[in-house]
Amino acid sequence: MIVNTRPSILANKTNDLLARSGIEFMHEPLTKILSISPSNQALEKLQQLDSYDVIIFTSQSAAKFGAPYLQKHTSKNLNLLIMAIGLATQRVLSEHGLVSEVPSGFNSAGLAELIEQGKHEKCLIFCG
């Protein structure tokens, strides 16, 4: 028995896969993801985008809620390296017009490897 606790908006794909696989499961959304206004400190960091070597999005929610702020504070001439953990996160970023790389393995270990290979010292991470 699997209990899928993801918010309804993020659970459908998993629920469909579980149902097609014949695995017993129930969907019990125990969390809710809401958008709030960023703090002044966060807005300051966004105004310094050119000082980061890489911008990282760790989840679909981080991309959904963070991408608009990134777009707002990014000059069209600024060439940012953007990384996404997973294809779903990359798809959300693409919907916002942002091109991103996905680490092999689609996980934190793959991300760490990519960062190490690129010698990225200063990262801005959107997670959520």
Indicate residue ranges for each PLM-predicted region:
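Conserved beta-alpha
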Residues: 1-128
